[in-house]
A protein has these predicted regions:
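Intrinsically disordered, low-complexity regulatory segments
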Residues: 2-140
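Prokaryote-biased recognition of long, low-complexity C-terminal linker/tail segments
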Residues: 142, 146-183
Length: 183
């Protein structure tokens, strides 16, 4: 957020450029029409996935391309890149995707803090970490399952009940539990 950027900039001083990605910058395609042309969307069968033959395809949504371009321009000239996102799976995914999309040379420094105070930011800057790939893979597994199940099941559910109905990995079992409880 602009307020966080301003506060962190003030703490770090003029030697640092602080910018925000404003959240996620890459995602799985929303539908097969969103799959980049270098991939054959006819070969991607979201419902028939076997271990070992599935590869996630990430795209930069149109509304994120400008910010990615701006961040890449800064990262290309920076002697070091620090990635400060939330210390959870979503934050790790944002950091991972920033590293990939910005084509950061070398390993970016991953910093984490739970409050934006001078002591917390300084401590994080003095003790950088690396991107936790395990935490990213955890995010990726959840996101992939959500998308695969949603792609397959939501259109069928909409056919039964209306344009704005969807279901997924969590919704389906949760609804089942509610139905069983009510019976």
């Amino acid at each position: 957020s602009p307020t966080k950027v301003k506060t962190i900039s003030k703490i770090l001083g003029p030697d640092y450029i602080v910018k925000s990605s404003v959240g996620h910058i890459r995602d799985l395609p929303r539908n097969t029409k969103s799959i980049p042309s270098k991939f054959d969307s006819k070969k991607i069968l979201w419902g028939a996935v076997k271990p070992g033959n599935f590869e996630n395809i990430y795209v930069i949504p149109e509304d994120r391309k400008k910010i990615v371009s701006e961040l890449k321009e800064i990262a290309d000239t920076a002697p070091e890149v620090y990635l400060a996102t939330d210390d959870d799976r979503e934050g790790e995914a944002i950091a991972y995707h920033l590293k990939e999309a910005l084509e950061i040379k070398g390993e970016p420094k991953r910093i984490k803090f739970n409050e934006i105070t001078e002591s917390a930011v300084t401590k994080a800057m003095n003790n950088p970490d690396t991107i936790d790939v395990g935490k990213f893979k955890s995010y990726e597994a959840r996101r992939t399952l959500d998308r695969m199940i949603g792609y397959e099941i939501s259109p069928k559910v909409r056919d039964l009940g209306g344009a704005f109905i969807s279901t997924g990995r969590v919704q389906g079992p949760a609804i089942r539990l509610i139905v069983e409880r009510e019976e």
